[in-house]
Amino acid sequence: MQSTLSQSPGSRFSQYMALTKPRVTQLAVFCAVIGMFLATPGMVPWHVLIGGTVGIWLLAGAAFAINCLVEQKIDAMMRRTAWRPSARGEITTPQILLFSAVLGSVGAWTLYTFTNPLTMWLTIATFVGYAVIYTLLLKPMTPQNIVIGGASGAMPPALGWAAVTGAVPGDAWILVLIIFVWTPPHFWVLALYRRKDYENAGLPMLPVTHGEKFTRLHILLYTVILFAVTLMPFISGMSGAVYLTSAVLLGAVFLAYAWKIHRDYSDELARKAFRYSIVYLSLLFAALLVDHYARPLLGV
């Protein structure tokens, strides 16, 4: 184990940042920010935008730090995650707990102060859903971990919406539903080409418990459902033609990947599909934002 005294402040900072899973956090916070803007026809007040963004990021980082702590032995057995400082023993359990507690406390205070109590409590509930219910209970016990546990990961748009309005109306839940349905195919393509990793770690991911063929079929089925669900913002009147066009085009590409995986699987194809799924969700929510402000300008 590397001595903590021999590390530079910059190296130590990078290790703690790694615990927050920055790439995953960025996507979650991005979806939350989009939720903020969709909640109002005008601009989001600056104190809400900044306070909400920072508070949600801090609590998300706190949840991911707990995830790294709980799964440090599992991470050490997987090639994809063995580099994490928690898996390498470079940060101790008390240090991770303290780090998570500080992030979570400051995040909760920030949300309470700059947004509203509802946003704070919803974000804390999301923290519990991910760090406790998903990480401790669902992930090691059932192949449906991603399906059930995806509820907590799908919450960011509702958190952003609540930060602005103090409520979570039907339109916000449509956005939550999109991410909820997107989550299984996104993670299952990863689990397909990382199947050996999950087998070695003893995690009951779908390809491990039900096989590759079953997983490929369910990726296709969930992607078809996702395509239909992404039409709901247009059907409900929340979004217009700009979003609809984007959703159809982006969804068609995702469907093409899912169909190819179902018919002619390869690890390289699964890697490409996994990377595209991240781009897909980012562009889909960006299209929601563009459509939201373009509709008044276009008079529709």
Curated annotation (Swiss-Prot):
One Pfam family in the UniProt entry: UbiA
UniProt membrane topology term: Multi-pass membrane protein
Keywords: Cell inner membrane, Cell membrane, Heme biosynthesis, Membrane, Transferase, Transmembrane, Transmembrane helix
Biological processes, Gene Ontology terms: heme O biosynthetic process
Compartment(s): Cell inner membrane
Known pathway: Porphyrin-containing compound metabolism; heme O biosynthesis; heme O from protoheme: step 1/1
EC number per UniProt: 2.5.1.141
TM region(s), chain numbering: 24-44, 46-66, 94-114, 118-138, 146-166, 172-192, 217-237, 239-259, 278-298
Primary subcellular site in the record, as a coarse category: membrane
GO CC entries: plasma membrane
Enzyme class: transferase
Ranges in coiled-coil conformation: none
Reactions performed catalytically: heme b + (2E,6E)-farnesyl diphosphate + H2O = Fe(II)-heme o + diphosphate
MF-aspect GO terms: protoheme IX farnesyltransferase activity
Purpose: Converts heme B (protoheme IX) to heme O by substitution of the vinyl group on carbon 2 of heme B porphyrin ring with a hydroxyethyl farnesyl side group.
Misc. remarks from the entry: Carbon 2 of the heme B porphyrin ring is defined according to the Fischer nomenclature.
HAMAP family: CyoE_CtaB (MF_00154)
UniProt similarity note: Belongs to the UbiA prenyltransferase family. Protoheme IX farnesyltransferase subfamily.
Protein name, as recorded: Protoheme IX farnesyltransferase
Source species of the chain: Burkholderia cenocepacia (strain HI2424)
